[in-house]
UniProtKB/Swiss-Prot annotation:
Protein name (Swiss-Prot/TrEMBL): 3-methyl-2-oxobutanoate hydroxymethyltransferase
Signal peptide as annotated in the record: none
Positions annotated to bind 3-methyl-2-oxobutanoate: D61, S62, D100, K130
Underlying gene: panB
Domain of life assignment: Bacteria
């Protein structure tokens, strides 16, 4: 895989010099440039991720754990996803924003998938949705694609089915399971997915699946043989310490830095060194004297301070 012509250098078409990446750009990246994808859950994080040059932003249902403090992703609602997706879209100019369809918003049938997918796509402004699994949800994938809603697939460890899988375990370690994963990947490609996430899959298996697909794969715990990589932003920045998956590389310790900053702020507030003169606003001497004279005229005295 070469390193020329990244999607992020696509010819700008907007008046401000950038344009949003499309599914066509993502497809064209296969075999040309690895794709960088990260999660974002609000306007500020989207601005950071987009401004740093990520190709795709995933508004994942992982927000249930990372942002809302829940134990898993299963309780995240469509309304919650819409709330976060809108904020992310507002903070993004170039990266392609993809939204997870929450648990039980598509598994119950084609009609539900279309109604919920259309609402998520139309009301939030995301440019694609992501569904987990294959088999039973293939009709939903086809229906969404036929309706004009781009779909990203997700195979391997699928967090919405973690209970069924017996926990967070690597998938595809047996030959039969690896072949089943490959067949599912082909089925999702044929159903119209423009790309595919492979999560917690042995690296050699993910590499071979990637080499036999026409659509790009994006790995998370699936080795360097995928066409791109995705991580949870809060994991790679050291902001979320409840879980520490093996596949996460921590690029910063922002939780530590933030904790030190907050502690320093609290200390300065308590000792009276913040705010300093440069952080405050003054008043004309004459106006202040007039203000004090008015207070004295009213007989307003200072309240005694505590011991």
């Amino acid at each position: 895989m070469s390193t020329h012509t990244p999607p992020s250098s696509a010819t700008p078409t907007s008046g401000q010099g950038v344009r949003p990446l499309t599914t066509a750009d993502i497809r064209k990246a296969k075999g040309r440039q690895r794709l960088a994808m990260l999660t974002a859950y609000d306007y500020t994080s989207a601005r950071i991720v987009d401004g740093a040059g990520a190709d795709l932003i995933l508004v994942g249902d992982s927000l249930g754990m990372v942002m809302l403090g829940r134990e898993d992703t299963l309780s995240v609602t469509l309304d919650e996803m819409l709330h976060h997706c809108r904020a992310v879209v507002r903070g993004t100019r170039h990266a392609m924003v993809v939204a997870d369809m929450p648990f039980m918003t598509y598994e119950t049938g084609v009609r539900d998938a279309l109604l919920n997918g259309a609402r998520l796509f139309r009301e939030s402004g995301v440019r694609a949705v992501k569904l987990e699994g294959a088999g039973p949800v293939l009709p939903q994938v086809r229906a969404l694609v036929d309706a004009g809603i781009p779909v990203m697939g997700h195979l391997g460890l699928t967090p919405q089915r973690v209970a069924e899988m017996g926990g967070f375990k690597v998938q595809g370690r047996q030959a039969e399971a690896a072949l089943r994963l490959f067949d599912d990947a082909l089925a999702l490609q044929e159903a119209g997915c423009f790309s595919l996430v492979l999560e917690c899959v042995p690296a050699p298996v993910a590499e071979q699946v990637t080499a036999r697909l026409h659509i790009p794969t994006i790995g998370i715990g699936a080795g360097a043989g995928c066409d791109g990589q995705v991580l949870v932003l809060h994991d790679m920045l050291g902001l979320y310490g409840e879980l520490s998956p093996r596949f996460v590389k921590r690029y910063a310790d922002l939780a530590g830095m933030a904790g030190e900053a907050v502690a320093r702020y609290a200390h300065e507030v308590r000792e009276g060194s913040f705010p300093a003169a440069e952080h405050t606003f003054g008043i004309d001497d004459g106006q202040f004297e007039a203000f004090m004279a008015a207070l004295d005229k009213r007989g307003c005295r200072q309240t005694p301070t505590g011991e």
